[in-house]
Regions:
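Short secondary-structure boundary segments
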Residues: 97-98, 125-127
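Conserved Radical SAM active-site core
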Residues: 3-7, 19-20, 37-114
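Charged phosphate-binding loop/patch that engages nucleotide di/tri-phosphates or the phosphate backbone
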Residues: 163-207
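Glycine-rich nucleotide phosphate-binding loop and flanking beta-alpha elements
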Residues: 31, 73, 129-130, 183
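Receiver (REC) domain switch/active-site residues of two-component response regulators
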Residues: 120
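N-terminal [4Fe-4S]-dependent radical SAM core
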Residues: 1-24, 29, 33, 37-43, ...
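Short, hinge-like loop/turn segments at secondary-structure boundaries
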Residues: 24, 110-116, 139-142
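P-loop/Walker A phosphate-binding loop and immediately adjacent motor/lid segment at beta-alpha junctions
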Residues: 74-94, 132-174
Length: 207
């Protein structure tokens, strides 16, 4: 099975609880104004990577994986296979989607149902640039909701009240940025020029 991938950060603390393997899918049918990853909207682009190769990139010691985009549920079959394999390894799964949970649960395709079944934390709803969220860590706008689909995580965990973080990595002549800055720094972050790396590059948590 091949996954159409825009970006991977093998180990990050800026995309969910604990140290996580973060993967951004290439392609999204939604067009949220102010999307922080407009280069990930087109389904053409990115890299087609075998599921086994993606799993081989997950380093030891991470707590879980986070799936972003693009739109993970536009790649439900591959995303579900990755999430299932991660859960079999004892890893948690966090998914950011621009769709609403209710709409996803109403879908009839088995892949979407399986992806939901393998998800511990679902952040749903389209990003709204007019409603930036500065109170909840990792969440782009106040209309987006956090669903704890398993008992593995809790809403009262202090990690959700901490400040957003931005990670910057220098890889040769490239700067790789991921995460989401505090609101006052957003303009500066948006103004940066970022160059794509082979499978790891700038991304944000908004959908």
């Amino acid at each position: 099975m091949l996954l159409q991938i825009a970006s991977v950060v093998p180990c990050t603390e800026a995309e969910g609880p604990g140290k996580r393997f973060a993967l951004w899918f290439q392609g999204c049918p939604l067009r949220c104004p102010g999307c922080c990853n407009p280069e990930y909207l087109q389904f053409q682009g990115g890299r087609a990577v075998a599921l086994s190769d993606v799993l081989g990139q997950i380093p030891p010691g991470v707590e879980g994986i986070t799936l972003l985009g693009g739109e993970p549920f536009a790649h439900a079959e591959g995303a579900a296979a990755l999430a299932r394999a991660a859960r079999e390894r004892g890893l948690s799964v966090m998914v950011f989607t621009g769709y609403l949970r209710e709409d996803l649960e109403a879908r009839t395709d088995p892949a979407s149902a399986e992806l939901l079944a393998c998800t511990d934390i679902l952040v749903d709803g389209p990003y709204d640039r007019e409603r930036p969220d500065s109170a909840r860590r990792w969440i782009g706008s106040t209309n987006q909701r956090i669903h704890f689909l398993t008992p593995r995580y809790r809403a009262d965990d202090p990690c959700w009240q901490q400040r957003n973080t931005l990670e910057i990595r220098v890889r040769g002549r490239e700067i790789v940025v991921n995460g989401f800055p505090a609101i006052p720094a957003l303009g500066l972050w948006k103004g940066w020029t970022r160059k794509s790396a082979p499978i790891a590059r700038k991304t944000g948590t908004q959908e």
